[in-house]
Swiss-Prot record:
Family of the protein in this entry: Belongs to the class I-like SAM-binding methyltransferase superfamily. RNA M5U methyltransferase family. RlmD subfamily.
Alphabetized UniProt keyword annotations: 4Fe-4S, Iron, Iron-sulfur, Metal-binding, Methyltransferase, rRNA processing, S-adenosyl-L-methionine, Transferase
InterPro entries hit by this protein: 23S_rRNA_MeTrfase_RlmD (IPR001566), MeTrfase_TrmA_AS (IPR030390), MeTrfase_TrmA_CS (IPR030391), NA-bd_OB-fold (IPR012340), SAM-dependent_MTases_sf (IPR029063), TRAM_dom (IPR002792), U5_MeTrfase_fam (IPR010280)
Protein residues bound to [4Fe-4S] cluster: 77, 83, 86, 165
EC number(s) stated in the UniProt entry for this protein: 2.1.1.190
Function: Catalyzes the formation of 5-methyl-uridine at position 1939 (m5U1939) in 23S rRNA.
Record-level Gene Ontology MF annotations: 4 iron, 4 sulfur cluster binding; iron ion binding; RNA binding; rRNA (uridine-C5-)-methyltransferase activity
Every TRAM domain range: 5-64
PROSITE patterns per UniProt: SAM_MT_RNA_M5U, TRAM, TRMA_1, TRMA_2
Protein name per its UniProtKB record: 23S rRNA (uracil(1939)-C(5))-methyltransferase RlmD
HAMAP family referenced in this protein's UniProt entry, alphabetically: 23SrRNA_methyltr_RlmD
Pfam families assigned to the protein according to its UniProt record, in alphabetical order: TRAM (PF01938), tRNA_U5-meth_tr (PF05958)
Residue numbers binding S-adenosyl-L-methionine: 275, 304, 309, 325, 352, 373
Length: 445
C-alpha cells in the first residue's frame, strides 16, 4: 500500500533565514529540523507555508517578508515566484555576483585549500533580455480548454502559464502570449510537447517538435506566424536529426553571431550548442585569449571546442590552432566557420575526450597554449595529460566550480600554479556559476 502524504498545515509559520542553499533557497532551522524556503534571503524574517514535509527536512515558500534583507529587490519578472527558470530574481544582481564569487572561492578551498594568486574582476552584462536560446514546454489542457507555453514551475513538472519572460531577448520573451495563441489554434496542439527558440545577431528561429504529422492548415499557420515576424521556421518530427527548415526555403541556412573583438563571424544551426548570453560571450572570448597571451608563433589546442567559439578568434592571433570536439557535426561546423572567415591555420578533430587519446595524432603533438571548456563533468582525463602536451599556460573555462576545483587540484599536483580565477555572470538570476581560471607551469628550480 502506498504511504499517504502527510497533510500540510494551512496556517503560515514564522522562520528566520540563516543562509542560502546551493539552489537559491533560504535555509531555516526550526526545532532542530532544516527547512528550505523559496523566495527567502539570509537575514530575513518570513512567514512561509509548507510545500513538502519530509522525515529529515521540510520545504516551503515565503508568503510574507516580515523583515526584508537589504539585498532584496523587486523581481523584474511577474512570474518569478512561479516559474522555475530563475531562482534569484528577488536578490540584487550585485549580490548575486558576489555570492557566485563566494561559491567559487569555497569550492577551490574545499579541494585542497586552493587559492588563486589573483582574483579576476567579475565579468558582468545585462541582467534582463540576455538569453538567446530557450526550450519551452507546450501543454494542451483539455479540461480547461487552454494551452500552456512556458518553463516548468518551481519544484514540479507542471508548465508555468507565462505571459512574458524578462530574461529572454525581448523579441522572444515579449511574445509568449502570441506563441501560446499560435499553439492553441493548431489542430495538433495536443501533439506538440515543446518548442525551441534560438537567436543569432539578426535572426530568430522557431523549432516545433511534433509527435504526429502536421496538417496543411497547421503548417500554413506556422508559416504565417514566422513570416509575419521574419523568423526562420523549423519542424522536428523525430529526434534532433529530423529538424528541417520550411521557411525561408532559400538563402542562408544558418544563424550567425559575431565576435567584434576578433573581426570574425560564426554560423550555427539553431540546435547547435552556443552560449546563451551573447553579451557575456563577446566579453568572455577575448578575455580568455588575452589570459592565454597568444603570440603569432604559438600553436594552440582548444579542447571541447564546439563549433569554434574560441578556436576561430584564437586563429586570428596564433600560428596554428587545433580544435577537438566529440561531435563530427561540430567538427564540420568548425571547418565551415574557418572557411567563412578565410582562415587556413586551423584543424579540427572529432574525439570523445573522456576516452583514451593516446592513438590520436593531435595528442602526440606539443602545444604552447591550451584552452579547455568542458561540460559539467569537467576534464580530469585530459588534465592528467597536460604535462605531456607541454603547454606553459592553460585557460580553463568552467560551468561547474566543483569539477573546476577538482581539476585545478590535479593541475597543481602536476606542476602548474593557479595564477588567476574569476566568475562570469553568464546566467543572471540563477545559481549557475560560470568561471575562468589560468594555470601556468611552474619553473623548475
Amino acid at each position: 500500500m502506498a504511504r499517504r502524504r502527510k497533510q500540510l498545515p494551512e496556517t503560515p509559520e514564522p522562520a528566520s533565514i540563516e543562509t542560502l542553499s546551493h539552489d537559491g533557497r533560504g535555509i531555516a532551522r526550526r526545532d532542530g529540523k532544516t527547512t528550505f524556503i523559496d523566495n527567502a534571503l539570509p537575514g530575513e524574517e518570513v512567514m512561509f507555508k509548507f510545500t513538502y514535509m519530509r522525515r529529515k527536512f521540510d520545504e516551503g515558500k515565503a508568503v510574507e517578508i516580515v523583515t526584508a534583507s537589504p539585498d532584496r529587490v523587486t523581481p523584474p519578472c511577474e512570474h518569478s515566484t512561479l516559474c522555475g527558470g530563475c531562482s534569484l530574481q528577488h536578490m540584487s544582481p550585485e549580490v548575486q555576483v558576489s555570492r557566485k564569487q563566494a561559491v567559487l572561492r569555497e569550492q577551490l578551498a574545499h579541494f585542497g585549500g586552493l587559492e588563486p594568486e589573483e582574483w579576476l574582476a567579475p565579468l558582468t552584462g545585462p541582467v534582463t533580455g540576455y538569453r538567446s536560446k530557450a526550450r519551452m514546454g507546450v501543454k494542451y489542457v483539455e479540461a480547461k480548454g487552454e494551452t500552456l507555453v512556458g518553463f516548468r514551475e518551481k519544484r514540479n513538472s507542471f508548465i508555468a502559464q507565462l505571459h512574458t519572460c524578462e530574461v529572454l531577448i525581448p523579441d522572444v520573451g515579449h511574445r509568449i502570449d502570441e506563441l501560446r495563441t499560435l499553439m492553441h489554434g493548431l489542430e495538433s496542439r495536443s501533439r506538440i510537447p515543446q518548442i525551441e527558440l534560438a537567436a543569432g545577431d539578426d535572426d530568430v528561429a522557431l523549432i516545433i517538435r511534433h509527435l504526429d504529422p502536421l496538417s496543411e492548415a497547421d503548417q500554413q499557420a506556422l508559416l504565417g506566424f514566422c513570416q509575419n515576424l521574419g523568423w526562420h521556421c523549423y519542424l522536428q518530427p523525430g529526434n534532433e536529426s529530423t529538424v528541417h527548415r520550411i521557411w525561408p526555403q532559400e538563402g542562408e541556412q544558418r544563424l550567425y553571431y559575431k565576435h567584434p573583438s576578433a573581426g570574425v563571424e560564426l554560423a550555427f544551426h539553431p540546435t547547435d550548442f552556443t552560449q546563451v548570453n551573447a553579451e557575456i560571450n563577446r566579453k568572455m572570448v577575448p578575455l580568455a585569449l588575452d589570459l592565454l597571451d597568444i603570440s603569432p608563433d604559438h600553436t594552440v589546442l582548444d579542447l571541447f571546442c564546439g563549433l569554434g567559439n574560441f578556436t576561430i578568434p584564437a586563429a586570428k592571433r596564433a600560428g596554428k590552432v587545433v580544435g577537438v570536439e566529440v561531435s563530427q557535426a561540430m567538427v564540420e561546423r568548425g571547418y565551415e566557420n574557418a572557411r567563412r572567415n578565410s582562415l587556413e591555420n586551423l584543424e579540427f578533430h572529432a574525439w570523445d575526450l573522456s576516452q583514451d587519446v593516446s592513438g590520436q595524432a593531435w595528442a602526440r603533438q606539443t602545444y604552447d597554449r591550451i584552452l579547455i571548456d568542458p561540460p559539467r563533468t569537467g576534464a580530469l582525463e585530459m588534465v592528467k595529460l597536460m604535462p605531456r602536451l607541454g603547454a606553459s599556460k592553460i585557460v580553463y573555462v568552467s560551468c561547474n566550480p566543483a569539477t573546476l576545483a577538482r581539476d585545478a587540484g590535479e593541475l597543481m599536483a602536476l606542476g602548474y600554479r593557479l595564477k588567476a580565477a574569476g566568475v562570469m555572470d553568464m546566467f543572471p538570476h540563477t545559481t549557475h556559476v560560470e568561471s575562468i581560471a589560468v594555470f601556468e607551469k611552474m619553473k623548475k628550480k
